[in-house]
Regions:
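Helicase motor core with emphasis on the C-terminal RecA-like subdomain
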Residues: 1-303, 311-318, 343-354, 358
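C-terminal accessory region of SF2 helicases/translocases
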Residues: 221, 239, 247-256, 262-441
């Protein structure tokens, strides 16, 4: 992002964990008017030093605050991130009438309304009370995308089909997988089949990620085989194809990932290869959501006992010893509790604020119901053309379905893209022969 801004003549910098020693210098440049754009991840708002010592000075001089991927603010959304809720605290402390712009390409009407409501409430808490939130929604039509689905009987058939398909498809692209292990397996098979690819997952270190992204942009590899770790911020205008080996759990997240293709070319191929194991994977990820109340109370009680005894903060590692939760799930839970005001991250770990906290069972049930509805919508997308769709006028067109699910305000009744497999705009190869499948087993 910083490099792209520089090429456009915009002076952009970022503050992150990799350049802490430069924070003072960057702040001085901001105060001197030598920076046009400061890029900060929402996760940075939970860093005690940044939150308490750096942010107040930066917010005071901001002429515009932009929230990208704003759908992450809403727990109605497919990609809720608790750290985004801290943006509300930032907005409440802005000088009067500071403009705020929130952008997203993947929010339906419900998520858009929730984001607007939360932003408005945050502004009203600060000195900018009385300001209204204006919501602008445009079309989601992407005429360069040729969408298709190929249902194959097993994993070996999908691997064999994929190797043959990429081998005959021009250009470079992304192959998305649902898990790290699947990404590694697919990448290994493609390399064995003579296709130049590399794996890109959440376990790939930052320097290697940057190198792999540059390799794809320069077409030094045919594809990156990636999990959702390859997402926000990546831009390759001439990306020629996106293939999903396994379906995402939501049409909204699917639309976001396939939207990386065809930004600067007239035609890009987008193929979904669903698997029978997809639902089990969705259920596993869903089970990693907010824990039951008894597990939350164990952590809160431990922090409160430490506070009452006059002790210091408890690290995440120490808190792991009082709960059966995995580290990643524990950290996610603590972030939600932080946003809710029950705990606070400080130097050395976490501490209780002493404020009462109620387990919002209705909220978590609502989020779970929304998650299951999104899963059913994804299954409906897979079955388009074979059975009626509950979405008005979208049974015979994949892009019309995605636009309908996302509440595209400009979708006209009966509209069809003319580019997907159901519209006759994309021909997909048949199932691979037994020899190819056998080689993939």
């Amino acid at each position: 992002q910083v490099a792209a801004a520089g090429r456009a003549g915009i002076r952009a910098v970022t503050m992150n964990s990799a350049n802490v020693t430069q924070w003072d210098e960057i702040q001085a440049r901001v105060r001197a008017g030598e920076v046009d754009v400061l890029l900060v991840s929402p996760e940075r708002l939970n860093n005690p030093v940044f939150r308490d010592e750096v942010l107040p000075h930066l917010a005071a001089s901001a002429a515009l605050v932009v929230i990208d991927e704003a759908h992450c603010i809403s727990d109605w959304g497919h990609d809720f991130r608790p750290d985004y809720r801290r943006i509300g605290t930032l907005l409440a402390g802005l000088p009067p009438r500071t403009p705020v712009l929130a952008t997203t390409a993947t929010a339906n009407r419900r998520v858009s309304a929730d984001v607007a409501e939360q932003l408005g409430a945050s502004l009203e808490e600060g000195e900018a009370s009385g300001e209204q939130v204006l919501v602008l929604r445009g079309t989601l039509e992407r005429d360069s995308l040729h969408l298709g689905v190929r249902v194959l009987p097993d994993a070996a058939s999908r691997l064999a089909w994929l190797a043959a398909y990429i081998g005959r498809t021009p250009g470079s692209g992304i192959v998305y997988c649902l898990t790290v292990s699947a990404a590694m397996e697919v990448a290994e098979h493609l390399r064995t089949a003579g296709v130049e690819v590399a794996a890109y997952t959440g376990q790939t270190d930052a320097a290697e990620r940057e190198r792999l992204e540059e390799d794809l942009k320069a077409n030094r590899v045919r594809a990156l085989v990636a999990t959702s770790a390859l997402g926000m911020g990546f831009d390759k205008p001439d990306l020629a194809f996106v293939v999903h080996v396994g379906a995402p759990s939501s049409p909204v997240s699917y639309y976001q990932q396939v939207g990386r293709a065809g930004r600067g070319v007239e035609r890009a191929k987008v193929v979904l290869l669903p698997g029978s194991e997809d639902r089990a994977i969705w259920e596993w990820f869903g089970s990693q959501g907010f824990p039951p109340e008894d597990r939350v109370r164990v952590v809160l009680d431990a922090l409160e006992e430490r506070r009452a005894a006059g002790g210091g903060a408890m690290s995440t590692a120490v808190l792991e010893t009082v709960t059966s939760l995995r580290r990643s799930r524990l950290e996610s839970m603590l972030k939600v509790l932080d946003v809710d005001g029950a705990v606070r991250r400080v130097r050395g770990g976490w501490e209780s604020t002493g404020r009462p906290w109620c387990y919002d069972a209705e909220r978590y049930a609502r989020v779970e119901a929304a998650r299951r509805a999104e899963q059913e919508a994804m299954l409906t997308y897979e079955r388009l053309g074979t059975e009626p769709s509950p979405y008005q006028g979208s049974s015979s067109c994949r892009m019309a379905f995605l636009r309908s699910v996302l509440d595209d305000p400009l979708l006209e009744p009966g509209w069809r893209c003319g580019a997907c497999d159901l519209c006759g705009g994309l021909d997909l190869p048949d199932a691979p022969d037994q020899e190819q499948v056998g080689a993939a087993r």
